[in-house]
Amino acid sequence: MNRLKKGDDVIVIAGKDKGRRGVVKSFAKGGSLVLVEGINIVKKHIKPNPNRGIEDGVVEKELPVDASNVAIFNPATEKADRVGYKFVDEKKVRYFKSNGELVDL
């Protein structure tokens, strides 16, 4: 179950960008892939297409990473953390499992 939301500060826990932080921009494939700002940047070679006005060159592009390779970043502990749900004033909120602080303020 993916407990991330758009705008969450996450840290990469596996892969070539391990240890880097970024903000969740969007989700793909039903939430199993996460597009994180500044993470998993690849270079794509573009062929020219004069009919469409596209020039050739190399473009840097962000690709999504698997949701299992990122974890939410806890600013209090400065580490990756797990998220749980609980009810506060009859409202369902997310909290960090390590210290019990609320994620959504």
Swiss-Prot record:
Species for this entry: Francisella tularensis subsp. tularensis (strain SCHU S4 / Schu 4)
InterPro entries, per database record: KOW, Rib_uL2_dom2, Ribosomal_uL24, Ribosomal_uL24_CS, Ribosomal_uL24_KOW, Translation_prot_SH3-like_sf
CDD domains listed in its UniProt record: KOW_RPL26
HAMAP family cross-referenced by the UniProt entry: Ribosomal_uL24_B
Pfam short name (any one): KOW
Classification lineage: Bacteria, Pseudomonadati, Pseudomonadota, Gammaproteobacteria, Thiotrichales
Gene: rplX
One Gene Ontology biological process: translation
Name of this chain's protein: Large ribosomal subunit protein uL24
Record-level GO cellular component terms: ribonucleoprotein complex; ribosome
SUPFAM superfamilies associated with the record: Translation proteins SH3-like domain
